[in-house]
């Protein structure tokens, strides 16, 4: 079991719990102060946690560095649910997942037979996927011409994934074949430095950052000229790595390259590129990834409590997590006692659902790996939309691949309870306005904000409105947040407060041990008015917290 599952008992795991260290309840502060303790801030859960608790952004990257070096951190873990980790079973599950996502069943056992690689046609690259130019005329080398264009070079960010043997696996823009020589240089550079017992992490030159993340047997590289720090780019690369694990499992990935070091992984991942593409698009515009947290659908507390209780009652023995979501926002989450979901795994589930419209066609039963929870094997996920014309999607995560009918019955019982209580009508009404307006806060110059409760792992933000209505402006705003975030979480010199003035807007960041707050407001505003607005905003969040957060998470 991955080391990301933690017990609630603070006496055993003081930095992995959301409860006060003495085990007693703490009075919630009415107004925020720099000394506000974790667990008392607006949005803090009162009945424990839903997610693996990461104290801060730095914890995520520190943990990854430890895992990469083989130095396992001391963490508290719950009793892992049983998962099939036999390679035959994993191979069968992968074949089912491949069929679900791409329409083509792929047999790992056949892939590993001697000489099988020669029998396969060369995988098609990503030419045209995200390309900036028109397809070339017949007879030309399409990928080479495309990748040589100035338009290709003008992309703000490129992402490459390759094997340690230098085989291309994925490229964000253009064709992997045309970029194979570039990827070969990248892996040669990594290998050259490692021969001297050094590790390359990033290169900074001419406004570009080149960031390397090595997770054997893969090497991931980002080339960017954005406001993101090298640390944040590395975190995005880790999301790509975990996305690959969610499709293959860590056990299968290791097994493949133990058998064939120069294996072309695109054979197994062919057809799933759109899932990785979608993940990169989400990371470019959804602040959930930047905040390392989940956002809740604004919902009356009584309605959310009824939904959570209905999920809790409609359970099967094999269920580990029951999740209801809409518009990439949480409606409710119920978990097995002592089992905690990692925000990264939840984001990957969101990405899986938003990447495929096939889940709307009926009840899907598909293998899925939650790599931060357990990278060794597949869970089985029952995925369905409650009604064809709504965005309410129900995920029921089970440990038993043969338990489809029992889990499907959980869905039926859950829907019956919602209808009996009239809750389905309240959910429909909430979906009519899945985001709230910043005007509700009542601060004239405030344009947008991000607020994260560190103890609950949840954040809230209003709808992005004018003057950020276009996709370009929304990405620019997120880029400003990324800049503030990178300054606040700088590994060598982190900042607690940042005041940024620009030609189009002013921004303020405030990071404490209990929460993170990023505010964007009119360029006509002053620093004094921004500081004054913090207290008004925090009081508003406190007032609305039972609508914006899940304060009483339930367990089986």
From Swiss-Prot:
<dbReference type="GO" id="GO:0051649">
    <property type="term" value="P:establishment of localization in cell"/>
</dbReference>
<dbReference type="Pfam" id="PF19037">
    <property type="entry name" value="Fuz_longin_2"/>
</dbReference>
<dbReference type="InterPro" id="IPR043970">
    <property type="entry name" value="FUZ/MON1/HPS1_longin_3"/>
</dbReference>
<dbReference type="GO" id="GO:0035658">
    <property type="term" value="C:Mon1-Ccz1 complex"/>
</dbReference>
<dbReference type="GO" id="GO:0016192">
    <property type="term" value="P:vesicle-mediated transport"/>
</dbReference>
<dbReference type="GO" id="GO:0006879">
    <property type="term" value="P:intracellular iron ion homeostasis"/>
</dbReference>
<feature type="modified residue" description="Phosphothreonine">
    <location>
        <position position="61"/>
    </location>
</feature>
<keyword id="KW-0344">Guanine-nucleotide releasing factor</keyword>
<dbReference type="GO" id="GO:0005085">
    <property type="term" value="F:guanyl-nucleotide exchange factor activity"/>
</dbReference>
<comment type="subunit">
    <text>Interacts with CCZ1. Found in a complex with RMC1, CCZ1, MON1A and MON1B. The MON1A-CCZ1B complex interacts with RIMOC1. The MON1A-CCZ1B complex interacts with RAB7A and this interaction is enhanced in the presence of RIMOC1.</text>
</comment>
<feature type="compositionally biased region" description="Basic and acidic residues">
    <location>
        <begin position="1"/>
        <end position="12"/>
    </location>
</feature>
<dbReference type="Pfam" id="PF19038">
    <property type="entry name" value="Fuz_longin_3"/>
</dbReference>
<comment type="similarity">
    <text>Belongs to the MON1/SAND family.</text>
</comment>
<protein>
    <recommendedName>
        <fullName>Vacuolar fusion protein MON1 homolog A</fullName>
    </recommendedName>
</protein>
<dbReference type="Pfam" id="PF19036">
    <property type="entry name" value="Fuz_longin_1"/>
</dbReference>
<dbReference type="GO" id="GO:0006623">
    <property type="term" value="P:protein targeting to vacuole"/>
</dbReference>
<dbReference type="GO" id="GO:0015031">
    <property type="term" value="P:protein transport"/>
</dbReference>
<feature type="region of interest" description="Disordered">
    <location>
        <begin position="113"/>
        <end position="149"/>
    </location>
</feature>
<feature type="modified residue" description="Phosphoserine">
    <location>
        <position position="91"/>
    </location>
</feature>
<dbReference type="InterPro" id="IPR004353">
    <property type="entry name" value="Mon1"/>
</dbReference>
<dbReference type="InterPro" id="IPR043972">
    <property type="entry name" value="FUZ/MON1/HPS1_longin_1"/>
</dbReference>
<feature type="region of interest" description="Disordered">
    <location>
        <begin position="1"/>
        <end position="88"/>
    </location>
</feature>
<keyword id="KW-0597">Phosphoprotein</keyword>
<dbReference type="GO" id="GO:0009306">
    <property type="term" value="P:protein secretion"/>
</dbReference>
<feature type="modified residue" description="Phosphoserine">
    <location>
        <position position="31"/>
    </location>
</feature>
<feature type="modified residue" description="Phosphoserine">
    <location>
        <position position="56"/>
    </location>
</feature>
<dbReference type="InterPro" id="IPR043971">
    <property type="entry name" value="FUZ/MON1/HPS1_longin_2"/>
</dbReference>
<comment type="function">
    <text>Plays an important role in membrane trafficking through the secretory apparatus. Not involved in endocytic trafficking to lysosomes. Acts in concert with CCZ1, as a guanine exchange factor (GEF) for RAB7, promotes the exchange of GDP to GTP, converting it from an inactive GDP-bound form into an active GTP-bound form.</text>
</comment>
<feature type="modified residue" description="Phosphoserine">
    <location>
        <position position="79"/>
    </location>
</feature>
